[in-house]
Amino acid sequence: MKKLSFLFLFLFFYILGSIPTGLVIGKLTQQKDLRNKGSGNIGATNAFRVLGKKWGILVFLLDFCKGFVPLTIFLHFSEFWPTEPSTQTFLQPHLTMKISLLAISPILGHMFSLFNKFKGGKAIATSVGIITSFNPLIGISGIIFFAIFLRLFGYASLSSIMASTLVNIFLWLNYLYCDNFGTLVPIQNQIQKPELFYFSINFATLIIIAKHYSNILRLIKGTENKFNFKK
């Protein structure tokens, strides 16, 4: 039963992540297809650029929730946590893998949307939602660092890459040296080999950086568009 429940949750999280929020909002509010405007991306940054600040913020929040809400519900769903001491050693490695897979499923859904011919955004907001679901301190810090880098350098793509990298570094430092300070879920105390979970976040970050490949090339060539704060 639990195997079926997990499979259902994985598919549900993927489908939820697949909802092309920016595309839907663009068409509903301004009859604009983000795929044909600006950078062609359906994420929050292009929504800011094409639809304006108000709708860009809404797209960011909804994409954030695609990662934050489902994983938060799962992490506090007691059915999946081992309660009998005699079964903890057996169940914990499987639990670690379940959490790791569920953590990246909304990200994969956003990047490879079922409703957009398996194309999508770069999943920055969704990833931040996932991080925030178990450690709000690090998740919010990632948003703050993104804003700082964006103000300093003016490039949303560069700011996303730098902030994502810093968040991964903070996760490992917090795990190795700070006893998971700020973590709302007992990852270290109830799960064997929690490193698997952090490696899954690292893997997702590598995919995010790879999705910025064209942006990186433009940054190197000096042709990347700067973010317009005035719109």
UniProtKB/Swiss-Prot annotation:
What membrane topology was assigned to this protein in its record?
Answer: Multi-pass membrane protein
Name one process (GO BP) from the record: phospholipid biosynthetic process
Q: Which residues form a coiled coil?
A: none
Name where it mostly resides.
Answer: membrane
Q: What is its EC number?
A: 2.3.1.275
Q: Tell me which domain of life the UniProt entry assigns to the organism this sequence originates from.
A: Bacteria
Location of the protein in the cell: Cell membrane
Annotated TM spans: 6-26, 55-75, 95-115, 130-150, 152-172, 196-216
A Gene Ontology MF term for this entry?
Answer: acyl-phosphate glycerol-3-phosphate acyltransferase activity
Q: Which Pfam families match?
A: G3P_acyltransf
The pathway it acts in is: Lipid metabolism; phospholipid metabolism
Q: Would you tell me the Gene Ontology cellular component terms?
A: plasma membrane
Keyword entries, A-Z = Cell membrane, Lipid biosynthesis, Lipid metabolism, Membrane, Phospholipid biosynthesis, Phospholipid metabolism, Transferase, Transmembrane, Transmembrane helix
Catalytic reaction annotation: an acyl phosphate + sn-glycerol 3-phosphate = a 1-acyl-sn-glycero-3-phosphate + phosphate
- InterPro entries associated with the record: G3P_acylTferase_PlsY (IPR003811)
Function comment:
Catalyzes the transfer of an acyl group from acyl-phosphate (acyl-PO(4)) to glycerol-3-phosphate (G3P) to form lysophosphatidic acid (LPA). This enzyme utilizes acyl-phosphate as fatty acyl donor, but not acyl-CoA or acyl-ACP.
For this chain, the family text in UniProt reads: Belongs to the PlsY family.
* HAMAP family, per database record: PlsY
Complexes and interactors: Probably interacts with PlsX.
Name of the featured protein:
Glycerol-3-phosphate acyltransferase
Native species of this protein? Aster yellows witches'-broom phytoplasma (strain AYWB)
Top-down, what is the taxonomic lineage of the species of origin?
A: Bacteria, Bacillati, Mycoplasmatota, Mollicutes, Acholeplasmatales
Gene, per the UniProt record = plsY
